[in-house]
Amino acid sequence: MTLREELLEEHWSYMDRYEAQMIARGPTLDHDTPTGSVHVVDLPDPVAARAFAFNEPSYQAGVYRDVLLRRWRNLLGRTMWDFPGGRTGGNRYLVLGLGAGPAADLAVPPERDQLIAYGPLLSDDGTAWLGTAVLIRAQDPHVAGAILTADRYADIEVHSWQFGGRPS
């Protein structure tokens, strides 16, 4: 059993405290092997966001080496639980567009029914665009990554992702 598996109940209990603020959550995967985790949480300020991320039991125990912490704007105005496609079926991806230059992809694309979460990554004070984060159901990683305007980003990362949280 991995450390991540050993701490799963403790992780879920910690996340339960943020249930009302949770927009999306779940692991990134390489096939069936977890490679990371996504948590999109509506918190009041950068101090609360840092406390949420760095007090999480798995992070404290060393399960994660790095944490990317960014302000994000929810352009869909919903949570992953409101996604009309449900928790299962199809391939799901995290797409991270890391900004380079002027802001891009600020409007919700026409594929809205395939979007689980969508919005810009922003500086702590919310004034500077740093990129775009998307959770999407798509045929494959190439189609998922194509949701963003490629030449407007320094890099676009695409990771397999699945809905997280306690089993229903």
Residue ranges and their predicted role:
Residues 1-168:
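Conserved, structured core segments of small domains
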